Every structure is written in structure tokens, then in C-alpha cells.
Amino acid sequence: MALTKAEMSEHLFEKLGLSKRDAKDLVELFFEEIRRALENGEQVKLSGFGNFDLRDKNQRPGRNPKTGEDIPITARRVVTFRPGQKLKCRVENATPKD
């Protein structure tokens, strides 16, 4: 099961007493700020959580799996996430819920 933006909004509504609309707007604004920073080529550092970085991948040769034809895979920019040490430790020591 995955945590969704709607569930995050619901948690903010329950824990902080925000209105449902304000909670939804807060979650949307948070992710919009991360998107904006990455679109501008900036690194996003969330203390105690991790870093979002941009990485440029070079063009490379590829192959169409159906036809076997060689095709170039174009150069592109990708987003990577590196978890921080605190997050790694908490995940490692967490007991999964069923």
C-alpha cells in the first residue's frame, strides 16, 4: 500500500486541526515547491529525510526488444533521491505493519 497526497492531507487535518482545504493546499504547495526547485536545476535538501538531485544521463545505444533493432536512447535529465542517514536508520529499525 502506498501513502498518497490525499492521505497526507487527511493526516494534517486530523493531527493539526487544519481545514481539509488548507491541508490539501499545504500538501500541494509542498510538492509544487520541490517541483519548482528541480525544474530550476536546484538540489532539494530535506534535513533528516534526504536529498533530491538532478543527474544528466548521456545518450546511449539501446535495442528494441520486439524487433532487435538498434535504437539510440536520447540524453535526458533524471531526478534521483538519496535518503539521509536518519531516514535510513528509522526504516531499517521499523517494524512493518500488515
From Swiss-Prot:
Protein's UniProt keywords contain Signal: no
DNA-binding recorded as keyword: yes
GO biological process: DNA recombination; positive regulation of metabolic process; regulation of DNA-templated transcription; regulation of translation
CDD domains in alphabetical order: IHF_A
Cellular component GO terms held in the UniProt record: cytosol
Highest taxon in the source lineage: Bacteria
SUPFAM superfamilies: IHF-like DNA-binding proteins (SSF47729)
Gene Ontology MF terms: DNA binding; structural constituent of chromatin
Keyword annotations from UniProtKB, A to Z: DNA recombination, DNA-binding, Transcription, Transcription regulation, Translation regulation
PROSITE patterns per the UniProt record, alphabetical: HISTONE_LIKE
Family statement drawn from the similarity comment of this UniProt entry: Belongs to the bacterial histone-like protein family.
Record's function text: This protein is one of the two subunits of integration host factor, a specific DNA-binding protein that functions in genetic recombination as well as in transcriptional and translational control.
Assembly description: Heterodimer of an alpha and a beta chain.
Protein name listed in UniProt: Integration host factor subunit alpha
Source taxonomy: Bacteria, Pseudomonadati, Pseudomonadota, Gammaproteobacteria, Enterobacterales
